Amino acid sequence: MNYATVNDLCARYTRTRLDILTRPKTADGQPDDAVAEQALADASAFIDGYLAARFVLPLTVVPSLLKRQCCVVAWFYLNESQPTEQITATYRDTVRWLEQVRDGKTDPGVESRTAASPEGEDLVQVQSDPPVFSRKQKGFI
């Protein structure tokens, strides 16, 4: 699941700039939204790597802040051959923010869901006898 769409990228960076970036990456030299969609998919997977530490994925609702961060990462990926200092700095800020989300220092606005714990009284329990050999046994051999 992508956290942003091509329309989100266009709204943030303009359609003209997006077309200029996607044109050289196609065989016929025409702008192609598939290139932008691939960058958004890669950015979403990158973000999932950080979110998976605290949240159950996929998210049911994507907050606007996460949508923005996805656009920033995708824009960096689209500019991979010649990123400007501003694009690189914004990308690094996004990575720092994702690290803070992963570590629990920042709230991304996502509903905190944990994995469902099993419910019921007939749960499996495993018991075993104490170990036969241990380091405390001396003079055995």
UniProtKB/Swiss-Prot annotation:
Kindly list the places in or outside the cell where this protein is found, as annotated in its UniProt entry. Host cytoplasm
Q: What gene is behind this protein?
A: J
Q: What induces it?
A: Expressed in the late phase of the viral replicative cycle. Expression of late genes is activated by the viral late transcription activator C.
Q: Does the keyword Endoplasmic reticulum apply?
A: no
What is seen without this gene?
A: Accumulation of unattached tails and full heads.
The name this protein carries in UniProt is Gene product J
From which domain of life does this come?
Viruses
Keywords on record: Host cytoplasm, Late protein
Q: Please provide, in alphabetical order, the Gene Ontology terms of the cellular component aspect for this entry.
A: host cell cytoplasm
Q: Which Pfam families does this UniProt record tie to the protein?
A: Phage_Mu_Gp36 (PF07030)
Per the database entry, which stretches of residues form a coiled coil?
A: none
Main location per the UniProt record = host cell
Annotated region described as Disordered, given as residue ranges: 102-141
Q: Does this UniProt record's set of keywords contain Oxidoreductase?
A: no
